[in-house]
Amino acid sequence: MAMPSSSLSSQIPTAAHHLTANAQSIPHFSTTLNAGSSASKRRSLYLRWGKGSNKIIACVGEGGATSVPYQSAEKNDSLSSSTLVKREFPPGFWKDDLIDSLTSSHKVAASDEKRIETLISEIKNMFRCMGYGETNPSAYDTAWVARIPAVDGSDNPHFPETVEWILQNQLKDGSWGEGFYFLAYDRILATLACIITLTLWRTGETQVQKGIEFFRTQAGKMEDEADSHRPSGFEIVFPAMLKEAKILGLDLPYDLPFLKQIIEKREAKLKRIPTDVLYALPTTLLYSLEGLQEIVDWQKIMKLQSKDGSFLSSPASTAAVFMRTGNKKCLDFLNFVLKKFGNHVPCHYPLDLFERLWAVDTVERLGIDRHFKEEIKEALDYVYSHWDERGIGWARENPVPDIDDTAMGLRILRLHGYNVSSDVLKTFRDENGEFFCFLGQTQRGVTDMLNVNRCSHVSFPGETIMEEAKLCTERYLRNALENVDAFDKWAFKKNIRGEVEYALKYPWHKSMPRLEARSYIENYGPDDVWLGKTVYMMPYISNEKYLELAKLDFNKVQSIHQTELQDLRRWWKSSGFTDLNFTRERVTEIYFSPASFIFEPEFSKCREVYTKTSNFTVILDDLYDAHGSLDDLKLFTESVKRWDLSLVDQMPQQMKICFVGFYNTFNDIAKEGRERQGRDVLGYIQNVWKVQLEAYTKEAEWSEAKYVPSFNEYIENASVSIALGTVVLISALFTGEVLTDEVLSKIDRESRFLQLMGLTGRLVNDTKTYQAERGQGEVASAIQCYMKDHPKISEEEALQHVYSVMENALEELNREFVNNKIPDIYKRLVFETARIMQLFYMQGDGLTLSHDMEIKEHVKNCLFQPVA
């Protein structure tokens, strides 16, 4: 049976066959080759630049070597059958002295290596300890639980430990609440709840008086805080408690205009709530039943009790229901929470889905997820086991889904290969196409809209709900950036503005893992707090250990990258490529590509091969584009097909340098590839390049003939000539995985996955370079070819069509990335190569003009600048 042409065991002659054929046709090296004529002794022929000389050293295996004079390009090009046209490119921005000076002074010391190991172990333990959610005490909710009278009928609290906690945890200023973070709304609410509870139990007179004094002096500060900083349900529960305090005779400033305004807001809100809605289905009103006691039908409300006995996971709301109904499930829930926390309760519990999703998101965005693969899988398996097509909330039995947890879950689960539908977002869309946090409500905040926006970019073809979500959230977030009061409804983060700016500027297809990690290290707050009914913290989400590990790990990896870059620069110079005057020297920018996405230390060889192969695609693209005659280019192509050094003498001098460097490099790559793959790969590499050079040649023929192909004809060839497939197919040999024929069939040139990578790369390249290339005489681009097919449309319309085709292809690429059943590293190679193209050509030709574009800053941040 004939093997597929893409197979590693294709019908390309073996390395030994090539050696024999080449030995007969290269007279300059016949003596050396004959010395190793025995088949058992044959080794691949390779060439080296002689150190400190203009000579090529020809070597056979580990045997002897002979050298022949080789004139540098600037001295003699008289052998050229045509004169190469010199095209001016901006010089390389990253100079040798800078690269050579990188001594990796920030290399991780032995003590830091030990610290990294310790942090990894501690974070693994955090994941293992995730149960129902770790969070801080809520003085407000604890005060409500402390109100419950003993069920035995005695005149005592049922949970005396909670009363004692209130007595022992008043802050120095007389308030109750989270001492770490001051929010007037939060402190006033918690303080009011505590002084009412202590008054009801006729205890803690000193604490009550201090609390009243705090209230009187600080209540006015609420007026200065943004409405978006008001805790959930504040306008419902605060006026109700204020009324209760007045009945108890507490000396509070009830006549403050601001307090009267809050009372008026409560009355207006209650008028807007139809009575039947309260009992029809679970809503966020269940979260604040303690503030609705005068209107609740307690018998009807019990139909909306959660399976765990709570009302929307709120201890305060559940305590209020229990005091009204004596429901045993309510008491069981409160006992369950106190068993976990001892003498206090949080503002909501459990928080199991929220905690797991955000912890996974944290380690992924910080770039340290590779250390926690098993823990991440366990966390996501847990979340998926509680996934609901209506959406999810912060807890597994929460009956009211929210868009924040749902969008985070949809995005992360989808990217990890779980089968989840985007239809889940329809739960949160109103009749006007707007998205909100909860069904039937108009609340939304920056953090939840940011998560919906991030989710919308992992869309599949035909998912209109994702496109609607993208447009809605982009509009909301851009407006939020202009409104200082918009930050934020649900969280107080170190730099949520920075997170939003990054997400809008570098959406999913333009955001590389190392760049996102660098950005999030700067934006991540280990002390971030969230806002529910009160301020609360999530120590397994916001934790200094994550940040410390991220910084140490980033700098460690960066030091490895710097050493690799130095080696690659030496390879470039030793290959004689500094003598080439027709091409771009972009070793650093090209190395940045794999370093930005396959950054892990174990993929060092893959990055090296990726960079070397990519450099050759640039050299040969420049050669075939405008700097070689068609005859010379055909000769070069034939030399590669035959792997034949005898044709070198017929080449122009600079083309000789290209071919010799090419020949040397890929013989070396093939040798190591054979060791890694356990079989010969030279024929495979030759075949990959054969297809590539044929695509280059076809474009050269079009250019010489001034031929403009149809759009489809152009795309078929240009998706190959962009050379991304060549880079990936050769680099894939060095991922540490054995590249089986089965895997190869799913990423070869016939696979949809690779085709989409090439298509999106070609289209984004054309949109940013077609005008400049047209000015240089190029006649074919996606835009020009589409205009040829549709002569009545404008250039702008053609450009927009190309963008549309690209966006659709990127959605299909998402689906291939998620659903392709191959090892993750191969999926990453293909998908991230497509993404890096979107980044490089975001502003313009980011490769050629890198010195004048943001790509320069990305290179610096990824490769040169350590994080502090």
Curated annotation (Swiss-Prot):
Task: Give GO terms: molecular function aspect only.
Answer: abietadiene synthase activity; copalyl diphosphate synthase activity; magnesium ion binding; terpene synthase activity
Phylogenetic placement of the source organism: Eukaryota, Viridiplantae, Streptophyta, Embryophyta, Tracheophyta
Induction info reads: By wounding.
Task: Tell me what the record says results from residue 586 to A.
Answer: No or small effect on substrate binding, but strongly decreases abietadiene synthase activity
Q: Which GO terms describe its biological process?
A: diterpenoid biosynthetic process
Q: What is the effect of changing residue 411 to A?
A: No effect on GGPP binding, but slightly decreased copalyl diphosphate synthase activity
First and last residue of the signal peptide: none
- Which consequence is recorded for altering residue 365 to A? No effect on GGPP binding, but decreased copalyl diphosphate synthase activity
Sorted UniProt keywords: Chloroplast, Isomerase, Lyase, Magnesium, Manganese, Metal-binding, Multifunctional enzyme, Plastid, Transit peptide
In the UniProt record, the transit peptide is located at 1-70
Q: Which PANTHER family match?
A: ENT-COPALYL DIPHOSPHATE SYNTHASE, CHLOROPLASTIC
Put simply, this protein is called Bifunctional abietadiene synthase, chloroplastic
The cofactors required by this protein are: Mg(2+); K(+)
Q: What is the effect of changing residue 848 to A?
A: No or small effect on substrate binding, but strongly decreases abietadiene synthase activity
Organism encoding this protein: Abies grandis (Grand fir)
Q: What is its EC number?
A: 4.2.3.18, 4.2.3.132, 5.5.1.12
